[in-house]
């Protein structure tokens, strides 16, 4: 059954996250399935993510059209014309924002439910600056914040929520795409350290709302 969520009470004000060590809560890989959007060009989708039990290799996937799609080995991009590639190699979403959506939607949202590769904790992803670099774990992995996620029909169909694209857009909590600066492995529990933060104030949320 398709459910229309209530109007969000969120504002665009910065959210106060509990003080904790920023870390990767879950690393999620695609469980390939039929695309739930009957109008989609691609008949398969990788939006359905499940937690990986071991470390996952992350490397630059190459161009969107000619590369391997996702930056995570073992992950799958269903429509390489719109997703994946070097500038969308990894998608991160904050567990804190998923928790807020659970309250809003009155349903459980497991890690990876929004199609994110990395479910983070202690990171305000919306206020990450474009060009900001994250060092993750101890294996040399460095990622750079590149862009916000733009919701698509497959996302809405996967969650089976009417008006989801408008609802998600209005909330302005899009999560962030990241490019791979230095390859390495990532696993649940790895710390996230901001290695570099640009002096500008262009954040993921600002670009999303532009």
Residue ranges: model-predicted function:
Residues 173-177, 188-190:
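A structural signal for small-residue-enriched, beta-sheet-centric alpha/beta enzyme cores
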Residues 191-196:
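Short hydrophobic beta/alpha edge segments that flank linear recognition/processing sites
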Residues 146-168:
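Histidine/lysine/aspartate-rich catalytic loop segments that bind and position anionic ligands
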Residues 2-137, 141-154, 200-210:
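Electropositive, beta-rich accessory/interaction domains or terminal extensions
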Residues 120-122, 175-182:
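Short alpha-helix capping/helix-loop boundary micro-motifs
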Residues 107-115, 160-173:
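Short, basic/aromatic beta-hairpin or loop at an interaction surface
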Residues 131, 183, 187-189:
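Loop/turn positions that initiate beta-strands
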């Amino acid at each position: 059954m398709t459910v229309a969520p209530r109007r969000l009470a969120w504002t665009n004000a910065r959210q106060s996250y509990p003080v904790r060590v920023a870390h990767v809560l879950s690393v999620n890989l695609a469980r390939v399935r039929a695309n739930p959007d009957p109008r989609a060009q691609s008949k398969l989708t990788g939006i359905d993510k499940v937690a990986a039990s071991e470390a996952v290799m992350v490397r630059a996937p190459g161009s969107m059209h000619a590369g391997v799609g996702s930056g995570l080995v073992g992950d799958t991009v269903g429509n390489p014309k719109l997703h994946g590639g070097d500038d969308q190699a990894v998608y991160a979403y904050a567990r804190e924002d998923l928790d807020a959506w659970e309250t809003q939607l009155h349903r459980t949202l497991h890690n990876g439910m929004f199609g994110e590769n990395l479910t983070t904790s202690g990171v305000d992803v919306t206020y990450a600056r474009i060009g900001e670099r994250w060092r993750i774990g101890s294996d040399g992995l460095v990622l750079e914040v590149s862009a916000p996620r733009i919701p698509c029909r497959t996302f809405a169909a996967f969650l089976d929520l009417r008006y989801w694209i408008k609802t998600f857009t209005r909330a302005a909590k899009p999560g962030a795409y990241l490019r791979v600066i230095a390859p390495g492995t990532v696993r649940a529990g790895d710390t996230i350290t901001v290695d570099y933060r640009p002096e500008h104030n262009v954040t993921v949320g600002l670009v999303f709302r532009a």
